[in-house]
Amino acid sequence: MIQPQTCLNVADNSGAKKLMCIRVLGTNRRYGHVGDVIIGVVKDATPNLTVKRSDVVRAVIVRTKQSIRRKDGSRLRFDDNATVIINKENNPRGTRVFGPIARELKDNGFTKIVSLAPEVL
């Protein structure tokens, strides 16, 4: 469950390392889960890359510590909360994605991120 003021890791090579959620997009949404789009501010960034510190960006949640319940009854839980920074067309701003991501992103229309990921669980 991601809510405003939650700090997340960034799982791509766009230049940001840490992101703080300031809004979960959707009508009156309080919590975000895997596959939800958030608005966040970059808290830590690598110098000389496309995303700078204090930039306001859109991102999609790819991993959460809160377990994901699947239709078959199984549960999936990750070690960290992570996002991938996206543009207005829901395409990733980076060219690589690090770490595993959940299969639920494919159902939400983020096929480009799924194709870049090294492992889909």
Swiss-Prot record:
Stored Pfam families: Ribosomal_L14
Localisation per UniProt entry: Plastid, Chloroplast
Stored SMART domains: Ribosomal_L14 (SM01374)
KW Chloroplast (keyword) present: yes
Keywords tagged on the record: Chloroplast, Plastid, Ribonucleoprotein, Ribosomal protein, RNA-binding, rRNA-binding
Swiss-Prot/TrEMBL GO biological process terms: translation
Residue runs in coiled coils: none
SUPFAM superfamilies (alphabetical): Ribosomal protein L14
GO CC annotations, alphabetized: chloroplast; cytosolic large ribosomal subunit
MF (Gene Ontology): large ribosomal subunit rRNA binding; structural constituent of ribosome
Record keyword Plastid present: yes
Entry-linked InterPro entries: Ribosomal_uL14 (IPR000218), Ribosomal_uL14_bac-type (IPR005745), Ribosomal_uL14_CS (IPR019972), Ribosomal_uL14_sf (IPR036853)
Assembly and oligomerization: Part of the 50S ribosomal subunit.
Family: Belongs to the universal ribosomal protein uL14 family.
Function: Binds to 23S rRNA.
Protein name, per record: Large ribosomal subunit protein uL14c
Species: Emiliania huxleyi (Coccolithophore)
Gene behind this protein: rpl14
